[in-house]
Design a protein with these regions (language model features):
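Extracellular low-complexity, Gly/Ser/Thr-rich intrinsically disordered linkers
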Residues: 51, 356-432
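An active-site-proximal structural segment forming one wall of the substrate-binding cleft
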Residues: 154-189, 219-227, 245-259
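Substrate-binding surface in catalytic domains of secreted glycosidases
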Residues: 85-107, 196-352
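Glycan-recognition patch characteristic of GH18 chitinases/ENGases
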Residues: 29-175
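Secretory targeting and sorting signals
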Residues: 1-27
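Conserved, mostly hydrophobic/aromatic
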Residues: 73, 137, 191, 260, ...
Length: 432
């Protein structure tokens, strides 16, 4: 299931109680050239549940060449309990699942009696192989943001939340294991509260309060108070300008963040009746949607509200969205009505490598189309319509990031690429 949907159609369009801890002048702790980086950031999400149906493991990042190209790897997701404290969404995948020699980054099988197993042990091995790579734990996500409002509610709840999360993920104190068993796996924390002041995922919806907007800022301040300024503190941030205004004090938020990743996808999807772009750089001409969304709309919205260019990292998708039963119309299916297209994991949602494979299936009649002005691609066979970003579009996105002097690119999610790393190579190779 996609954990990045944001349900535009479902969204309806106070002073801080305590002084905020002042950020040092050098608040961006990993500017270009620092920690060995010579260009903008390349951030990628590794999904915890990918080890199951997708059989995508940390070792695949080595085999595809992705690990060598990333500056940051975000591990998705850790969850929050009702009290707002950190918990694992899946301890088996996180630290209990044994790996064979073939599945392991080190090439050695996990041993009987070994304390740390699972994805976290593989991430530890990955860091040993790529010591400049920063690995952060991502908290929340589309299905894991329900209790962020509880965590951020009071000074006491914020302090308890941050302590629980840093104890668990930074100090490595995992339930049932010796203290510090996972110390050194994670360098920092990525907050994926989707979204402050928004119900988000409808099943079940987030707890929301009018003060979520201000409390998110205070939560970031508490993270800096407890973690200091030498660790990454990042956040995944929405594409919708209305949601930005509902949930974020932009200048204050970015004063605490190392950088923020801007949602550059899910502009349209299965919740819309018309086949439409989901990650275009610009709004295509003739777009019939009620609201206009694009990467340019999102970037402009954040920058105009005070986000620093150097800290604004644009998200790009390694997946596509599709509709079935779409008539050709005048634009090769674009804006035609349809229903979510059949797919492997979720109707209307398909990994890039699976969409690419459709082009080489025997007897297929798919053709590739591009809107060069708006900056997006789709394939269409007269009935089924998929929009996605291929290597050509990744290079286009990288050129856009360069031209806007943004802080880099973020990928959701790395498992969607081909085994050869086609997309990450195209994206990273074109970033400056």
């Amino acid at each position: 299931m996609s954990r990045r949907r944001w349900g535009v159609a479902a969204l309806a369009v106070g002073a801080l109680s305590a002084s905020l801890a002042s950020a040092p002048a050098n608040a961006d702790v990993e500017t270009n050239g620092h920690h060995g980086y010579s260009k903008t950031r390349t951030v990628g999400y590794f999904i915890q549940w990918g080890v199951y149906d997708r059989n995508f493991r940390v070792k695949n990042l080595v085999d595809s060449g992705a690990a060598a190209r990333l500056t940051h790897l975000n591990y998705a997701f850790g969850f929050l309990d009702e009290a707002g404290k950190c918990v694992s969404a899946d301890p088996w995948a996180d630290w209990q699942m044994p790996h064979t020699a073939e599945q392991s980054v080190s090439g050695k099988a996990d041993e009987a009696g070994q304390v740390l197993l699972g994805n976290l042990n593989q991430l530890k091995q990955l860091k040993a192989k790529y010591p400049k790579l920063k690995v952060n734990i991502s908290l929340g996500g589309w299905t894991g943001s329900r209790y962020f409002s509880n965590a951020a509610l009071t000074a006491e709840s914020r302090a308890a939340h941050v302590k629980s999360c840093t104890d668990m993920w930074i100090k490595g104190d995992l339930p049932g294991l010796p203290a510090g068993a996972a110390k050194g796996v994670f360098d920092g924390i990525d907050l994926d509260w989707e979204w402050p002041s928004s119900p988000g995922n409808p099943t079940p919806p987030n707890v929301i309060r009018p003060e979520d907007k201000q409390n998110f800022t205070l939560l970031l301040a508490e993270y800096r108070k407890q973690m200091g300024w030498n660790r990454d503190l990042t956040a995944f941030l929405p594409a919708d300008p209305a949601q930005i205004d509902r949930g974020f004090e932009v200048r204050k938020v970015f004063s605490y963040l190392t950088f923020g990743t801007l949602q550059g996808y899910d502009y349209h999807g299965a919740w819309d009746p018309e086949a439409n772009q989901q990650s275009a750089l610009r709004v295509p001409k003739g777009d019939p949607a009620q609201f206009e969304f694009s990467s340019e709309v999102t970037v402009d919205a954040w920058l105009s509200r005070g986000a620093p260019r150097s800290k604004a990292v644009l998200g790009v998708p390694f997946y596509g969205r599709g509709w079935d039963g779409v008539a050709p119309g005048k634009r090769n299916g674009l804006f035609g009505t349809g229903v979510p297209a059949p797919a492997k994991y979720e109707a209307g949602y398909e990994d890039f490598h699976r969409i690419k494979a459709k082009l080489s299936e025997p007897g297929n009649s798919y053709k590739i189309y591009r809107d060069e002005r708006a900056g997006f691609a789709w394939i269409y066979d007269g009935k089924t319509w998929w929009t996605y970003d291929d290597a050509t579009e990744m290079k286009r996105k990288a050129r856009y990031i360069n031209s806007r002097r943004l802080g880099g690119a973020m990928v959701w999610s790395l498992d969607g690429d081909t085994p050869q790393g086609e997309l990450i190579k195209a994206l990273d190779g074109a970033l400056k």
